[in-house]
Curated annotation (Swiss-Prot):
Residue sites binding Zn(2+) per the record: C27, C30, C45, C48
GO process annotations (BP): translation
Cofactor(s) of this protein: Zn(2+)
Gene Ontology CC terms: ribonucleoprotein complex; ribosome
InterPro entries cross-referenced by the UniProt entry: Ribosomal_eS31 (IPR002906), Ribosomal_eS31_arc (IPR022845), Ribosomal_zn-bd (IPR011332)
Protein name (Swiss-Prot/TrEMBL): Small ribosomal subunit protein eS31
Single GO term (MF): zinc ion binding
Family in the record: Belongs to the eukaryotic ribosomal protein eS31 family.
Start and end residues, zinc fingers (C4-type): 27-48
SMART domains with a match to the protein in the record: Ribosomal_S27
Source species, domain of life: Archaea
Record's cofactor remark: Binds 1 zinc ion per subunit.
Natural source organism: Methanocaldococcus jannaschii (strain ATCC 43067 / DSM 2661 / JAL-1 / JCM 10045 / NBRC 100440) (Methanococcus jannaschii)
Length: 60
């Protein structure tokens, strides 16, 4: 058995008509089905460690 709390993956999808919309970003290394965690300034994959930095928003 795994340690910790299990995730409810059904919360990461939205169904509109006949289409499925993924609400979270998927990892480009691991492929579809592995979602990336959204942090304040980055996206991170918990499986392989891949990380993408968010672009800072410009203030006008």
């Amino acid at each position: 058995m795994t340690k910790g709390k299990k995730t409810a993956k059904y919360k990461y999808y939205k169904i509109e008509g006949d289409k499925v919309i993924r609400l979270k970003k998927t990892c480009p290394r691991c492929g579809p089905g592995v979602f990336m965690a959204e942090h304040l300034n980055r996206y991170a994959c918990g499986k392989c460690g891949y990380m993408e930095w968010k672009q800072p928003q410009k203030k006008e």
